[in-house]
Amino acid sequence: MSASVAEPPPALSRKAEFKAAKAELLARFKSANHVTPLMHALSRATDDALRSLWQECGLPATLALVAVGGFGRGELSPHSDVDILVLLPDAHASELDERIERFIGMAWDLGLEIGSSVRTVGQCIEEASHDVTVQTSLLEARRIVGSTALFERFMLRYREALDARAFFQAKVLEMRQRHAKFQDTPYSLEPNVKESPGGLRDLQTILWIARAAGFGSSWRELDTRGLITDREARELRRNEGFLKTLRARLHVIAGRRQDILVFDLQTQAAESFGYQPTSAKRASEQLMRRYYWAAKAVTQLATILIQNIEAQLFPATSGVTRVLSPGRFVEKQGMLEIAADDVFERHPDAILEAFLLYEATRGVKGLSARTLRALYNSRDVMNNAWRRDPRNRRTFMQILQQPEGITHAFRLMNQTSVLGRYLLNFRRIVGQMQHDLYHVYTVDQHILMVLRNIRRFAVAEHAHEYPFCSQLIVNFERPWVLYVAALFHDIAKGRGGDHSALGMADARRFCREHGIEGDDAALVVWLVQHHLTMSQVAQKQDTSDPVVIKRFAELVGSERRLTALYLLTVADIRGTSPKVWNTWKGKLLEDLYRATLAVLGGAQPDAHSELKTRQEEALALLRLETVPPDAHRALWDQLDVGYFLRHDAADIAWQTRVLYRHVAADTAIVRARPSPVGDALQVLVYVKDRSDLFAGICAYFDRNGLSVLDARVNTTRHGYALDNFIVTQTEHDVQYRDIANLVEQQLAARLAESAPLPEPSKGRLSRLSRTFPITPRVDLRADERGQYYILSVSANDRPGLLYSIARVLAEHRVGVHAARINTLGERVEDVFMLDGTGLSDNRLQIQVETELLRAIAV
């Protein structure tokens, strides 16, 4: 008796065969540099499979199976949707419906991601007239199998109904709306290769518009038509090829449709292109820079092409032109137009003049397609001789010194690559991503954001945003000095070494070449060198210490330098990420500014006089609150000088009013209120001190989703802790007034318990932190006076991190005197002042540092 092996069902066999054929194609693609052959091969294989299913389902020859969308173009990425149209004759038997459903179901069973529609010719035309998306997908329709006559009749009706002008307007509006979803920038941390500005969809949109207008359906045809030049066509093909290849590789790596270049895939995608990490740049950073350059070129060329197509579709009536620069520029319909195509070749100094005129001429809203094209094709003119030309250096300084339009001018100079060709070191940081968990913009975009922020300080309409900064810049002479410092403060990022020192050398050279001399040049160079200093002092040092203020004042040296550094620092922090700036950081910086200004004005940083002033101000506030005279003494007699120096008069008055009747309280007193300095909750805790108190409070905040921004810990002479916290709720939109009572009750109840400290929860890291973890660092050392120990911690941010640190300190009976919690996007750089008599023992120090590193490890 012979054994027999059962044949697999036909559906399973078909699926296995198709899957094997597709796998073979993808395997070949892994070693190929170009994706177009793969896309065409996948499309052909899908055509063959669908034809086979069509015939198997016995669908009649009177119907037609039509590929639409990207499948219609004959281009399929590895896991793209397969969009098909089953085209029906006007009169058809109803029993066909069952066979069509079977066909579509079998296509799904084959493993195809089918997007299907079943319509007559009339229904297609009707649907397309109401929906530009349908109209677009039908534009590239291609017959796979079935009635040729029906398909040709459909295409004839479609072309007759297509209004090229209306289609142009609809697609341009659609593109603008799509760009708005991505904040109108290609420089996203995780760009969508297909949909983001400068992505594949922009290129497809141009070809759709051109095809609808009858101008051609390829870059070669648009070149022949005169809409683009040979050089532009080559650039478009090159960048289109890169974007298509990148998208296909994302699909292969992810094993599914994946158009977003997420952090998790950036390294693998980079390696698939052959990028290798260097000491200065990760492989992923090199890939992202290539992507941003491609997206930038696509954006620039798309602008030119769309304007050119618009000019063909909507010929302008001969409007009035205004001469702006004889023989060089005119204004035409609100756009800056070159007087002749070879203006930049004949007059290279006109290149920067174009941006000066755009910036300074009212009524000019942009550069015309003709001007943009001339700039794009004049890159060879922008050489060393052009950079050294004194006329260009004067014009560049004029652009910086205009009363308005500076931000727009510099953005346009960057978009057209002129800025990077004039400042070669700027070109090196265009499209350079910073995977420091802090900046969310590329270096060039961050620099321009900082420039924009400084400009906004000086614009009256934005004075309400940062009133103090606006007040300072009004009286700041020659504010263009700040703009130069902004341009150079991060220009040396990614070179290796200290970017502040390298940038300082670049800034000094720029000043020398552009006639910036004396105090102005010295200020620019000094600002670039010290652009991080004020932030570090305000957020990491004890600014209640007169010695800290005196040392910072000595570094600054003058009110002009202090004001310049303050304005640059605020603009810099605000230009890193929408999440990094908060009102608490603003208060720290403003307090440091005012304290330093007083010292520069001749005031001596004397602790005794400062203490007396704050006490007098606090007493005045208490009188307004009708607190009895001398009622404060019971509490104040238990407080040391440090308490009065670390708190302002308003906080001292509030805490005194709450506590003066309860100086010897038996139970914990907890009071909370919306923070006077911004969107946060201020929490006061007064209770008999114990070694695990700080950790216990942090445990409560952690369990309730409250992040600590600042902690000021005080111990009274009679053994009570008087601790003050500033906390925020970042996960949910919350009204702090509404949760104040709940925090008071819950935290007081938690402190009344004698339960041991809970195990810290290792909160989930963000995808960015998981992909680009930083090496945790712990540094523990005695301060200059030997009074406290300073603990500095740097790590990936995650829920529960502060409590993990506090618990280790509590286990070793190390008291926390003060804490500065500095969250920078996805990373933290926290500083603690510790009371730890035992820390003088080196073995204990090493043990604490080791356990802290273990606690903060990812």
Swiss-Prot record:
EC number: 2.7.7.59, 3.1.4.-
Coiled coil start-end: none
Catalytic activity, as annotated: [protein-PII]-L-tyrosine + UTP = [protein-PII]-uridylyl-L-tyrosine + diphosphate; [protein-PII]-uridylyl-L-tyrosine + H2O = [protein-PII]-L-tyrosine + UMP + H(+)
GO biological process: regulation of nitrogen utilization
Source species, domain of life: Bacteria
Residue span(s) of domain ACT: 682-761, 790-858
Cofactor: Mg(2+)
Activity regulation summary: Uridylyltransferase (UTase) activity is inhibited by glutamine, while glutamine activates uridylyl-removing (UR) activity.
Family matches, as InterPro entries: ACT-like_dom_sf, ACT_dom, HD/PDEase_dom, HD_domain, NT_sf, PII_UdlTrfase/GS_AdlTrfase, Polymerase_NTP_transf_dom, UTase/UR
Region (Uridylyl-removing): 325-681
SUPFAM superfamilies per record: ACT-like, HD-domain/PDEase-like, Nucleotidyltransferase, Nucleotidyltransferase substrate binding subunit/domain
MF-aspect GO terms: [protein-PII] uridylyltransferase activity; phosphoric diester hydrolase activity
Alphabetical list of CDD domains matching this protein: ACT_ACR-UUR-like_2, ACT_UUR-like_1, HDc, NT_GlnE_GlnD_like
The UniProt record lists the keyword Coiled coil: no
Any one Pfam family match given in the protein's UniProt record, by short name: NTP_transf_2
Keyword vocabulary terms for this entry: Hydrolase, Magnesium, Multifunctional enzyme, Nucleotidyltransferase, Repeat, Transferase
Domain HD: 443-565
Family from the record: Belongs to the GlnD family.
HAMAP family: PII_uridylyl_transf
Functional description taken from the UniProt entry: Modifies, by uridylylation and deuridylylation, the PII regulatory proteins (GlnB and homologs), in response to the nitrogen status of the cell that GlnD senses through the glutamine level. Under low glutamine levels, catalyzes the conversion of the PII proteins and UTP to PII-UMP and PPi, while under higher glutamine levels, GlnD hydrolyzes PII-UMP to PII and UMP (deuridylylation). Thus, controls uridylylation state and activity of the PII proteins, and plays an important role in the regulation of nitrogen assimilation and metabolism.
The protein's name in its UniProt record: Bifunctional uridylyltransferase/uridylyl-removing enzyme
